[in-house]
């Protein structure tokens, strides 16, 4: 239960005198004598000797603001899609069921997971998002999509694995194809 874990972290950070900023875009960074300071888009700032940033899909953007040399690396926003098994078939899955991995891409493969509430999900696939925060086909950001598809690492990947990338795309566009691949 990720929400509960995050809530506990929040409580512990606050109890130790820390503070948390939500939905705050970092625009600048200052290295002070005894601390570090982040400046946010709205003019607010936060300083401390330890700053933990949960930048997620914007980690590479933040690294550039912090002047961290990440060379020619960037985050590619892939999303994973899941489907719930119908209740009458959930009894078939007692725990985790994983496919035999492809040695070239051992992280890839739809699997079955029994959730805490007893339901069973199948997933994820892996498909390039059309925006950094594009969790479905309705969300597009053309500049972010261009940034992803023009990245040489992405181009190399799709050229090296055309069948796999096409299969993942088809599973995303068609529930029938997704289910048949299970």
Where are these regions (language model features)?
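Flavin-binding catalytic cores
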Residues: 69, 89-90, 115-119, 125-182
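FAD-binding core/adjacent interface of flavoenzyme oxidoreductases
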Residues: 4, 10-11, 15, 41-43, ...
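Flavin-dependent oxidoreductases
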Residues: 29-140
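A conserved beta-strand/loop element that lines the FAD pocket in flavoprotein oxidoreductases
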Residues: 14-26
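Exposed beta-strand and adjacent loop surfaces of beta-rich binding modules
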Residues: 23, 35, 166
């Amino acid at each position: 239960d990720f929400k509960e874990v995050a809530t506990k972290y929040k409580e512990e950070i606050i109890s130790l005198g820390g503070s948390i900023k939500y939905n705050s875009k970092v625009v600048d960074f200052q290295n002070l004598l005894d601390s570090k300071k982040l400046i946010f888009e709205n003019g607010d700032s936060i300083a401390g000797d330890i700053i933990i940033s949960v930048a997620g899909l914007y980690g590479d953007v933040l690294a550039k603001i912090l002047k961290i040399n990440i060379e020619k690396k960037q985050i590619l926003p892939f999303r994973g899609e899941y489907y719930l098994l119908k209740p009458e078939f959930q009894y078939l899955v007692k725990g985790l069921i994983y496919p035999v991995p492809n040695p070239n891409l051992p992280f890839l493969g739809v699997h079955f997971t029994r959730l805490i509430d007893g339901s069973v999900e199948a997933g994820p696939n892996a498909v390039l998002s059309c925006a950094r925060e594009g969790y479905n086909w309705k969300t597009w950001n053309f500049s972010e999509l261009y940034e992803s598809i023009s990245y040489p690492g992405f181009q190399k990947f799709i050229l090296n694995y055309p069948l796999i990338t096409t299969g993942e795309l088809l599973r995303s566009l068609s529930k029938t194809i997704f289910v048949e691949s299970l």
